[in-house]
UniProtKB/Swiss-Prot annotation:
Entry superkingdom: Bacteria
Name the record gives this protein: Small ribosomal subunit protein uS12
Positions carrying 3-methylthioaspartic acid: D90
GO terms classed as biological process: translation
Organism listed in the record: Wolbachia sp. subsp. Drosophila simulans (strain wRi)
Subunit details: Part of the 30S ribosomal subunit. Contacts proteins S8 and S17. May interact with IF1 in the 30S initiation complex.
Family: Belongs to the universal ribosomal protein uS12 family.
Keyword field: Methylation, Ribonucleoprotein, Ribosomal protein, RNA-binding, rRNA-binding, tRNA-binding
Keyword RNA-binding attributed: yes
Gene: rpsL
Single Gene Ontology MF annotation: structural constituent of ribosome
Pfam family, one: Ribosom_S12_S23
Family matches, as InterPro entries: NA-bd_OB-fold, Ribosomal_uS12, Ribosomal_uS12_bac
A GO CC annotation given for this chain: small ribosomal subunit
Purpose of the protein: With S4 and S5 plays an important role in translational accuracy.
Length: 124
């Protein structure tokens, strides 16, 4: 136990909070990366599906797992993608989303509603 004098000199260390999206750093809302693996995985109980995810290599950080939203995609190994924060609740370890319609990932085909979230231009 420290003495009063030691506390006056040094003080106590405050708690450091763990970042929810460490790969984005302090000031980046998005970051670019290269896909190293594109695959499907199954969600936690009680859900059942084949969720599309990709391992993305970010320069200056390492590899993260990112979710590919929407129906259908054209991603493959070495595709360049833009990732944003945002976890997928039923996929453990997936804390990032890939942005549709940016860089190598096309927008969702035949999407009419919520187009801005899936990178689809207005038609007609």
């Amino acid at each position: 136990m420290p003495t009063i004098n030691q506390l006056i000199r040094k003080g106590r260390l405050g708690l450091t909070h763990k970042k929810k999206v460490p790969a984005l750093g302090k000031s980046n809302p998005q970051r670019r990366g290269v896909c190293t693996k594109v695959y499907t995985t199954t969600p936690r109980k009680p859900n059942s599906a084949l969720r599309k995810v990709a391992r993305v290599k970010i320069s200056g950080y390492g590899e993260v797992t990112a979710y590919i939203p929407g129906e259908g995609h054209n991603l493959q190994e070495h595709s360049v993608v833009l990732i944003r924060g945002g976890r997928v609740k039923d996929l453990p370890g997936v804390r990032y989303h890939i942005i549709r319609g940016a860089l190598d990932l096309r927008g969702v085909q035949n999407r009419k509603k919520a187009r801005s979230k899936y990178g689809v231009k207005k038609s007609g």
